[in-house]
Amino acid sequence: MKNTFSRLFGFGDKESEFELQDESHEEIDKKVYEEIQEIPIVNITPNRYQPRTVFDDARIEELALTIRTHGLIQPIVVRQYEDDKYEIIAGERRFRAATKLGWEKVPAIIKNLNDTETASVALIENLQREELTAIEEAVAYQKLIELHNLTQEALAQRLGKGQSTIANKLRLLKLPEEIKNALLEKSITERHARALIPLKNEELQLKVLQEIVEKQLNVKQTEERIAKLLEEAKPKRKAKQKAVSRDTRIAMNTIRQSLQMVADSGLNVNSEEEEFDEYYQITIQIPKKK
C-alpha cells in the first residue's frame, strides 16, 4: 500500500518510504535497510532543500536540554550521497541540538531516496508544522510546484488546502527582498506584508515598511496608510464632473471585486481604469497560462 507521501506525489511503493505525519506522531517503519546507526556528526550535512532558513536558538537550546535529560527518542533520518557522507532528510532541529550538546555521533536511520523524493519529504515535513514563517511556507509551495510540475490548484488539492491559501502565500514572493527579510525576521506579520502588495511601487512599499517598523503600526493602521497612498496616486478629477449614478458605482465595484477574486485564485490579472466625460473604461489583461 502506498504511504501518505506516495499518494500525494505519485511515487511508487518503496519499503524505504515513511509516513509524513506530525512529528509528535511520526512513526519510522522498522523494515530492511532501516536499522538505526550511529553516524559521526561531521559526516552529516543539512538538507539543501530545507525551507526553514531561520532556526530559533532558544528553541534549539530547549530541545538540547530535553535530549540531554531524556536522550534522543526519535533518530534523525538521512540519505547517503557519497561514501561516509549523509544528508538530512528529517530532523535538522534534533541534529542541531545534538551538535550543541557536543555529541560526536547521532542515531540515524538511512533511507534510499532520490533528489526529488528527498526535497519533497523535507518540504512536506516542514509544512506540517506551524513554525514556518509565511515566506518559508511560500518558498516550500513554490518548490513543490516546480518539482512536480503542478498548478496551484493541484497542489492545494494534494495538500488539503484552499487554492486561495496557496495563491496568497505565493504572492508574497513577489515582494521586495527587504520585505521578505522582515517577514523572515518576524519584524512584520503576514497581514502587514499582504497589505503592501496593492502598492505595486517598490519605493512606496519600502517607505511604508520603514513606517511599520519605526512607528510599530498595527495591521489596521497599515491598511489605512496604504489606502491613503493609493487614493493620492489616483489621477486628479476634473473640476466639473457629472454625477455618477448609483447603478454605475455598483457596476464598477462589482467588476473590481470580481477582478480581486480572480487574482486571489492565483491568476495574475492586470487591469487599468480610466475615467472619461461620458463613461468609465476598464482594460483587463488575462494571461492564457498561469
Swiss-Prot record:
Effects nucleoid occlusion by binding relatively nonspecifically to DNA and preventing the assembly of the division machinery in the vicinity of the nucleoid, especially under conditions that disturb the cell cycle. It helps to coordinate cell division and chromosome segregation by preventing the formation of the Z ring through the nucleoid, which would cause chromosome breakage. Residues 153-172 bind DNA. This is Nucleoid occlusion protein. It holds the Pfam family ParBc. One of its GO terms (cellular component) is chromosome. Keywords: Cell cycle, Cell division, Cytoplasm, DNA-binding, Septation. GO terms for molecular function: DNA binding. The gene is noc. The keyword Cell cycle applies. Belongs to the ParB family. It is found in: Cytoplasm, Nucleoid. GO terms for biological process: chromosome segregation; division septum assembly; positive regulation of sporulation resulting in formation of a cellular spore. CDD domains: SPO0J_N.
